[in-house]
Amino acid sequence: MGNWNKYIPKGMKDILFEESNIKLDIEDQLRKIYKYSGFSEIISPTIEFYDVFNSNIQAIPQEKMYKLFDNLGRILVLRPDMTTPIGRITGTKMKDCTYPLKLCYTANIFRVNEKLNGKRGEITQSGIEIIGTKGIKSDVDSIVTAINALLSLGLRNFKIELGEAGLFEALTENMRIEEENLKKLKEIIRNKNYVALKKFLDEISLKYSKEDFEIIENLPKLFGDIEIIEKAKALTKNEKALKSLNDIYNIYKSIEDIGLGSYISIDLGMVQNIDYYTGVIFKGYVEEVGDSILSGGRYDNLIQHFGIELPATGFAINVDDIMIALKKQNTMSMDKDKKVLIFYKEEFLRKAYDFMQELKMKKIICELSLLDEDKEILLYSKKKGIDFIIGFTREEKLFVKDLKSDKIAFLEKNEIEDLLMV
């Protein structure tokens, strides 16, 4: 057996320096959006009992979970999603809270990825859950919060696609298709494989009811703006399906009325592979990333598995994919704090330290130099992206070097503070 002490497991990643700072900035910005939209942050354990995720509504297949055992032999998992633990917390610790609950989180989730397709095994998700209301107001609030979150990060040209989990269920419930065939049908529609869909429906046409075959056959083609809803209605008389279509229509119109209609579209072929969704579902896309950067929807039956029946809706943003998109768009909108390095002679240590503390209070990144040689100080500063070098070497004015302009000046402390605050 080889020695793996210099490596990390497949699907994991070390995040260093500037990339780490950018990621933290993104997380902080999302937290601000949630906070000022009335959401309260909660934190769940990284390790949960496997039973939390092992119900008849299985969000994540068990083979996608990282499993381990505790000292009593019980199966544990690294949490594969955040919505289910929040359902557990709500059902066990929040029964007496004021509803609707508006919760938010930013946390890492873990999923086994057997395929060598570059997908991460550790993913940072940031999202919200609105718990305790059934009406479309909470669906609209969730989607609008998602749009505002992406806008706050400076992301361009994204789209939130709306679908409805109940639509597919309504169209197939009378067909009584076996579970295996149902999974196959979902996958074909999700992949918009028109040829395979027609072939599949032809093969089962003699065995099952053909009542809604026409609209099912057209589901992959039914995407675009709000006119798609009327086209879909013309293809079915299924009352449950028509209700699902009306829900999407009303949600779309509400978001349009707010003034955010340009960020949404409809995709009636959106069929989720996560079983707990019951109503409107949505995914966020941007050209620079192949997969969805955001996903969410209504899940009214999940929390009952933890002791209380409560409807809910929410979404999760993939922070790692957001970083990729922002980098490719060259639209990092995070504030870049000025960086200062202070070098000093030993007799001026206290003055240098006090000045460093003053600058930190003004949100300027500042450190005392651990090096003494001028060349070493300059090289270190350039490599680390320092903006200004300040020197405490005499009683009079302080040495100041602007590394961008390469200019040198001797200034009073208040003059330096004015310079740094520009």
Swiss-Prot record:
Gene3D superfamilies: Bira Bifunctional Protein, Domain 2 (3.30.930.10). Keywords: Amino-acid biosynthesis, Cytoplasm, Histidine biosynthesis. The keyword ATP-binding does not apply. Pfam families: tRNA-synt_His. Its main location: cytoplasm. Pathway: Amino-acid biosynthesis; L-histidine biosynthesis; L-histidine from 5-phospho-alpha-D-ribose 1-diphosphate: step 1/9. It is found in: Cytoplasm. Belongs to the class-II aminoacyl-tRNA synthetase family. HisZ subfamily. This is ATP phosphoribosyltransferase regulatory subunit. It comes from Clostridium botulinum (strain 657 / Type Ba4).
